[in-house]
Amino acid sequence: MKTMTQMRKPHVLLHSTKTMQAVAPRLQTDTSIDGGPYVQRGSTQNFVVSYEGSLGADGQTFADAVLAVCEQDYTFLQSVFGNISIQGLPFQVYLRLGDSNNGGAYHYSCDATALYCFITPGEPTELASMLVVAEEDEVFMANQNVGWNCGYSNGEGLSRVLATELHPSALNGFASAASWLDSNRPDWVDNTEQTDTDYVSIGCATLFLNYLRYQLGMNWSNIVQAGGDTLAQTYSNLTGASDAFSPFATLLQSRFPQGTPSGLQNDNPFPIG
């Protein structure tokens, strides 16, 4: 009798103009390290940070930038996720050499604490920290287990807004809101798309989460701890109301009329009005 071989698809933070040609699904049993050889630059209580030797001095610079803030960022995530315990620590951060075909970050399961971040020399050093947070917070989601799925649009949206909250200047190339505003604006609030690579559904998610935070005035801790299988469920958990999408879409229509290019270069146009 043949045994089905199970594969793990990487969960990714995809750059808007780059692919990940160097990344592919792997066997469930494969625990090897992608890329390398690596140079370990340093460690903290919850992180070990290494860079590909091919990055040279740039690798040291980016690794040092991560080491300088990673514990501070971890403390923020611990707070908003309700001080839950995280399994599999420390995080192993691997900074890989990026190029025009490889950008963003990934890990091989939502709870995987080996985090890979593509870095291209010349990019802002804060980018590395933003990428780490975007993958790290997905591990928090998996350990929390209240509905945020790192491979679905709701979890990918949360991943991005929390990373941007901590590192707003590093969003360039990862902003997704305009992709939804400039589309036919499907309802990815009442529905969740089962992918983390569609910029339209991700854009809807980042907009809605920022709407909760910066239009309705809810704090990140309450939002994160009110997770559900859809963003509408999160809204209902927070407010007791069921009409999540319509007021949100109507408000955005007032600022960004559908059919007209939005021109929005970040994920947070709020507050509006």
Where are these regions (language model features)?
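Zn2+-dependent metallopeptidase catalytic core
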Residues: 1-136, 140-150
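Beta/coil-rich, acidic/histidine-enriched accessory regions frequently appended to metallopeptidases
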Residues: 24, 229-273
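Solvent-exposed loop and beta-edge segments used for protein-protein assembly and interaction
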Residues: 43, 201-203
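Stable alpha-helical elements in mature extracytoplasmic
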Residues: 62, 66-73, 128-136, 154-158, ...
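Structured segments of extracytoplasmic/periplasmic soluble domains
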Residues: 69-84, 139-143, 162-165, 169, ...
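Post-HExxH zinc-binding segment in Zn-dependent metallohydrolases
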Residues: 73, 149-199, 210, 217
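Short, solvent-exposed aromatic-acidic interface loops
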Residues: 97-99, 225-231
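Secretory-pathway/luminal and periplasmic proteins that interact with or process carbohydrate-rich
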Residues: 100-104, 166-172, 232-234
